[in-house]
Amino acid sequence: MAAILGKKIGMTSIYNANREAEPCTVIQAGPCFVSQVKTTENDGYEAYQLSIGERKEAKVSKPLRGHFAKAGIAPGYKVVEFGKDDMGLDLEQGSAVSVEIFSAGDAVEVQGVSKGKGFAGVVKRHNFSGGQRTHGQSDRLRAPGSVGGASDPSRTFKGTKMGGRMGGKTVKVKGLEIVKVIPESNLLVIKGSVPGVKNSYVQIVSSKK
């Protein structure tokens, strides 16, 4: 098991052994630093808090400055907690975690925040087919249709598919494969796409299956 924080750089394509172009995502994973070690005695569970990036101290609140100073590391941009089982390593506060914990061919799960699409109607958001394109139809082409009768059920059921804000949610993609590890640049090349926009932070964890 292994886990790390990374920043999505963008997408590219790599040719496989069969000379077929495969879409890949490039992630700058680390170096990360252990900002806190949580133990059963103090916190009731075992976990590692990882920090990535480096921020100016003036931009960080005083309590956070003290938190990072206690670990002997610079303030980070993003802090995420991973269970000890997910990490699969015995780490100390302040120690570094690099991409070298992964190798090519490893199966991973990547979690991030999907791209926000803004307000979307039911056709785009839920793949509704829309109204009939027939004679007399004027404005029902992309409408949701009935969402609850006046007399029965005389209400709209909770969870009814309607227009609304689309995207911008936490998404986890499973069954991805690491194609290449570039330790000197702290880069992971992962086959396929991962959630999020460019420069957004993602969590990479070894697949449990």
Curated annotation (Swiss-Prot):
One of its GO terms (cellular component) is cytosolic large ribosomal subunit. GO terms for biological process: translation. Transmembrane segments: none annotated. GO terms for molecular function: rRNA binding; structural constituent of ribosome. Keywords: Ribonucleoprotein, Ribosomal protein, RNA-binding, rRNA-binding. Residues 127-164 are annotated as: Disordered. The keyword rRNA-binding applies. Gene3D superfamilies: 3.30.160.810, Translation factors. Pfam families: Ribosomal_L3 (PF00297). Part of the 50S ribosomal subunit. Forms a cluster with proteins L14 and L19. One of the primary rRNA binding proteins, it binds directly near the 3'-end of the 23S rRNA, where it nucleates assembly of the 50S subunit. Belongs to the universal ribosomal protein uL3 family. HAMAP family: Ribosomal_uL3_B (MF_01325_B). This is Large ribosomal subunit protein uL3. It comes from Chlorobium phaeobacteroides (strain BS1). The gene is rplC.
